[in-house]
């Protein structure tokens, strides 16, 4: 049977080993040594407001904070698997997508210029301390013209062939444009919280719709 250890961090010291708290009663958790899944890593989400907050610090403090989060040093958190939004999430400075030109099925107006202001430099700074940092990306909302109704904060993807193809191409363009910036997107997730109709950017999907979109 494997021993379970309690690890915690405080502002004064990280990765401390805690002393188990005694409690009455018998534990009903039994570990049999069988492993079903592999944990690839831990991390957080890159977003615009996070980068704006980081920039309020002096440059040396920014570097120190990023090192504490991402470096492989014994005293760092060693974050190595993070996520990021495709377009706006609930921590964007305001709502946007990477192509808000209605009817642009060829994505001629697709652009990551806005991401070059915050998200891309944020990720690049983190990668100076974690060169092998893995990223997965997901949209909170498609471009509004691809949705019914055409708004960021709720609704569904218009289920028409040309619209579905354009949205698939949207993901491909995103990955390729980030690759041009030296950033590899390791995974794409089709939708953040697909069953949540939120007051911030969101889009509802059924399981059948996700299956069909990913398959086709």
Model-derived regions, located:
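Extended, charge-biased low-complexity segments
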Residues: 2-5
């Amino acid at each position: 049977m494997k021993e379970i250890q309690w690890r915690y961090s405080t502002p004064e010291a990280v990765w401390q080993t805690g002393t188990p708290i005694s409690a009455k009663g018998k534990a009903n958790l039994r570990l049999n040594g069988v492993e079903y899944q592999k944990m690839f890593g831990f991390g957080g989400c890159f977003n615009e407001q996070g980068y704006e907050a980081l920039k309020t610090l002096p440059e040396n403090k920014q570097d120190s904070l990023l090192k504490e989060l991402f470096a492989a040093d014994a005293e760092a958190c060693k974050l190595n698997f993070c996520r990021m939004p495709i377009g706006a999430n609930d921590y964007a400075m305001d709502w946007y997508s990477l192509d808000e030109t209605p009817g642009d099925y060829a994505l001629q107006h697709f652009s990551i210029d806005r991401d070059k202001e915050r998200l891309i430099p944020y990720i690049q700074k983190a990668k100076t301390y974690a060169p092998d940092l893995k990223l997965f990306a997901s949209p909170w909302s498609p471009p509004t013209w691809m949705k019914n109704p055409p708004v960021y904060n709720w609704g569904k993807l218009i289920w028409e062939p040309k619209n579905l193809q354009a949205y698939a191409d949207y993901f491909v363009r995103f990955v390729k444009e980030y690759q041009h910036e030296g950033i590899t997107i390791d995974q794409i997730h089709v939708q953040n919280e697909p069953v949540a109709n939120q007051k911030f950017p969101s889009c509802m999907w059924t399981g059948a719709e996700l299956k069909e979109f990913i398959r086709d």
